[in-house]
């Protein structure tokens, strides 16, 4: 088993890995819209979604996977009004991949967080 970290302070504080690879599977924890290099959070949901997807792509690459290997995605948004706003980012990232997907409207742990995306990838 391989554990992957992005160095986010949340990983150490909350005791989790950004991703865990086991066999042909890669489980990527929920990723919020921070630019984890600067810890800056954009205000707009679309910008947050794009940051989430960029972080996910980087994590998958470091694990030996790619976006094309994603088989499941869960989106968590704090406001259903943000759904339309993030659709362009989702269509660009997943339009050709078409993983199984769930979208949930729920609160997140910080008030500035509008979007969280979690994925599972498989190479078999």
What are these regions (language model features)?
Residues 1-71, 77-124:
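N-terminal presequence-like segments and the immediate start of the first folded domain
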């Amino acid at each position: 088993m391989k554990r992957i970290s992005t160095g986010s302070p949340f990983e150490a504080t909350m005791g989790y890995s950004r991703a865990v690879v086991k066999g042909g599977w890669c489980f990527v924890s929920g990723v919020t819209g921070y630019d984890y290099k600067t810890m800056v959070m954009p205000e707009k949901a679309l910008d947050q979604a794009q940051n989430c997807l960029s972080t996910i792509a980087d994590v998958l690459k470091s694990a030996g996977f790619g976006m094309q290997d994603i088989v499941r995605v869960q989106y968590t948004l704090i406001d259903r009004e943000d759904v339309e706003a993030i659709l362009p980012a989702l269509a660009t990232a997943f339009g050709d991949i078409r993983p199984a997907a769930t979208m949930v409207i729920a609160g997140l742990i910080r008030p500035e967080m509008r979007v969280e995306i979690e994925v599972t990838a498989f190479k078999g």
